Every structure is written in C-alpha cells, then in structure tokens.
Amino acid sequence: MGLTHMHDTDALPAPYDVASPVRQQVGLVFASPHSGQHYPEDLMAATDLSKLSLSRSADNFVDELFSDAPDHGAPLLRAAYARAYLDLNREPWELDPQMFDEELPDHVNGTSLRVAGGLGTIPRLAADGSRIYRDHLDFAEVRERLNRVYFPYHHCLARMVEDTQLAFGHCVLIDCHSMPSAGGMTPGRGDDIRFGDSGRGIGRDQRGDIVLGDRFGTACAPELIDCAYRTLSGLGLRVQRNNPYAGGFTTYHYGRPGTGVHALQIEINRRL
C-alpha cells in the first residue's frame, strides 16, 4: 500500500503489517486490531501485571484464523501492538482522566461508557479488572503513542478501504475479533453493545458461536449481514446479531453503506 512508517529507533516494530494477495480479486478487506503481540518495554516497566495477565485482554490468534484471506484475493491488516497498550477499536482520544494528574485537552473524550468501564483508547483495566498502570500517565507520552501506533494503523486501513472501493466500486470491511465464552460482571471485553455500552450488567449469558455486528443496520447493507448469517448458520454455528456486540469504532467509523463502504464486525467465541 506504500504506507511504510519510519520511527526514531529501529528497535520499535511497525504498528501493523499487511498480508496482501498477489492481486486483490475481491472487494473485501480484513482487519484484526486486537491480536497484536508486542508488549513494549515502557508498558511492562509501568505495570505490576505479567505479560500473561495483559494478554488476556487480547484477541489472541485471531489474525492467524484469518491468515488465509490473501489466498482468496483479499488483504489482511494485522495490528502489531498489544491491546493492553493501545486499543485500535476506539476513538483516538477516548482517554480516562483518572489516569492522568494533568488536565486533558478539550478534544479528549473522557466521558464515554468505554472510558467509564476502564477500557478507553489506553485501557485502565486488564481483562480481570486489575489496574494496568501503577502511576499516572503523561499526556505527551500518550499523544506520542497515538502518533506512533494508532494513527498509522488507521491511515493504512483508510487507504486500503479507499483503494478497494476505487478498484471494485465498493468495499466490505470485516473487522475480526474473538470473545469470551460467557459474559460476566468484570469489564473484560468492553466493546460496544447498544451503541457504546461497555457490556457490564449483561449477566452471565451463554453466547453464540459467532456474533455479527453492523451497528443495528447502520454500518452495512442488510443483504451482507443476512448472507453472513445464513452462511455461518449453514455450517452448524449458532449465530447472533448485534448482541452482545454491535460493533466498535472501526465498524461505525468506516461503515457508510450509502457510499458503497460496508463494515461488519465478527466475534468468534473462544470456546471454539
């Protein structure tokens, strides 16, 4: 895609990589924002939690589940950095004021339900509800983190969507995730339910095998989610729509069916 990002030090990995087909043959783009496995030194130095504890917040191995996408003519965008370090399926400035000892700029969204649940762009809590950082964060460092990881990822994704739409007249973005097998009262997931609810209070539901999220019909054409539902159900999987996950930032930000860009979030139950 011509989007190689250079950093001040070679020790820092690129924020993403793209697995591309020899030639893109379908108007599909796959993205895996929560499967990154790089836990930077600055994160590990600032937390009392182990890498194993932090990794429970991730959608581990989801990028591998979709690794065959290029063989079928579609590109796959894979995040490199751990979700506990930075959540790419959030607005860029969903930051928790309690994590800072300085006043945050006006453009920061510190009042979303995701932030309230400890699961903003820079998560405050790990999957088990433990606090990630022992001390306050510096806003300048967080801004640099966003510039280094968040914005390059989304610039790349936006370019992939644009290129696909130009080539095929449309683009279907599949945002790939995994989910715990059952809901609980800890804020372990935190993606959108009912347009932004953190998912707390769902109770201990037994979830389906697959949850498809289209923001209640606003992010993709109904024919697309209907087709996905029929196809997956036909494989013997138990499929739910928009419950408990209707789709996060990526789904509602990129999904513009009226312009030919459709976004669908897929959650795969980890018990599978």
Walk through the language-model features, giving the residues of each.
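N-terminal catalytic or cofactor-binding beta/alpha core of small enzyme domains
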Residues: 2-173, 178-272
